[in-house]
A protein has these predicted regions:
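N-terminal acidic leader/helix
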Residues: 1-30, 65
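Surface-exposed aromatic
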Residues: 30-36
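Detector for the mature cores of small, proteolytically processed
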Residues: 41-71
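Generic detector of leucine side chains in alpha-helical contexts
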Residues: 10-12, 37, 70
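A generic structural signal for short
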Residues: 1, 36-37
Length: 71
């Protein structure tokens, strides 16, 4: 699991809000960082994966597709 800066978190959250009106929840704890979505959407997941790939991160979604970490 990769830890990213808060500025990068804000860029992702802003991009998702502007394109989809989707609120991406950011969770930062001692065990690391992870994100959760409110909407189950393949389009949003693809957008997030592509957006983060441009920043040299790989998105790893859990089985539900509603939570993800970065590598």
């Amino acid at each position: 699991m990769t830890i990213i800066s808060f500025d990068e978190v804000l860029k992702l959250k802003k991009a998702c809000d502007e394109k989809f009106k989707e609120h991406v929840h950011f969770h930062d704890a001692c065990g690391g960082q992870y994100f959760t979505l409110e909407t189950d959407s393949d389009e949003i997941r693809k957008f997030i994966a592509d957006f983060m790939q441009k920043m040299n991160y790989k998105v790893v979604f859990d089985k539900s597709g509603m939570s993800f970490t970065l590598e």
